[in-house]
């Protein structure tokens, strides 16, 4: 494999010295970029784009051509895993993802099993293709949804505002939910390890919906299964450590518990104070975040002010990867994203070295 020309992102995740704070953006390959929209139109549908190795590679690389980012992230979707389990993923126009065969009967759940990873070969082919296209420019991040977040879509049959179906199952038939979560945890572990084998140099677990749970439920139905995955991941590849990032949206309450799961870094959403978060986790993990995606709708001056505030909040030393507190909004101005990236590089040098 090609030698990495820029490994700042990987070093920051391992709290090793860096010259500046690295940055990438969740959903950096996405609808805010006109070139992404053009490629997506060429592909036909979102799922076709995910499954076309050449086009998935193209959209992964697009933001790196425009911005001086320190990492690329595989272009895919968290719902590829339940789709491979036979749930029939489709995207309804203007409604987001849906499953044709949601898990709403005990008999469906009894039949649920870890999918054959060959059904996800298109994802691993994309990882290998992207690594080749990157040619050592920056590291490539692989990812998956968390067991609970995947279960939300699998049980609800799509997105939800109140998660009534899955919460009903959680409180009335927890045995059924345990079965789904355990299957998901095994599947995600195999899926991420296959991404690492294909060339992913770091992996992120997205727990988008963990924050809708009570304190006890988060620990029992989400964190426990993320810990299971982290324990089963390959942590070395190509002669270097493969860092693991866990991002739980709305998870700021549980940082102390999340430190215990064995990840190298925790992602923060924009509601957290990053300085307080650093004090709470001590030197145990790196932190990633946590610029409010909506702040990109501000002026160039307000974007610079917000970047400075976050960098000052984190303070001196390594262990910070700059990111948004959630995915970039589809209406964001790419020029404002460029200001964000360049400002992070410019203003962060004073916090490193010397």
Swiss-Prot record:
It is an enzyme of class 4 (lyase). Pathway: Porphyrin-containing compound metabolism; protoporphyrin-IX biosynthesis; coproporphyrinogen-III from 5-aminolevulinate: step 4/4. It holds the Pfam family URO-D. The record marks 77 as: Transition state stabilizer. CDD domains: URO-D (cd00717). GO terms for molecular function: uroporphyrinogen decarboxylase activity. The keyword Iron-sulfur does not apply. InterPro entries: UROD/MetE-like_sf, Uroporphyrinogen_deCO2ase_HemE, Uroporphyrinogen_deCOase. Homodimer. Catalyzes the decarboxylation of four acetate groups of uroporphyrinogen-III to yield coproporphyrinogen-III. GO terms for cellular component: cytosol. Its EC number is 4.1.1.37. It catalyses: uroporphyrinogen III + 4 H(+) = coproporphyrinogen III + 4 CO2. Keywords: Cytoplasm, Decarboxylase, Lyase, Porphyrin biosynthesis. One of its GO terms (biological process) is protoporphyrinogen IX biosynthetic process from glutamate. Substrate binds at residues 27-31, 77, 153, 208, 326. This is Uroporphyrinogen decarboxylase. It is found in: Cytoplasm.
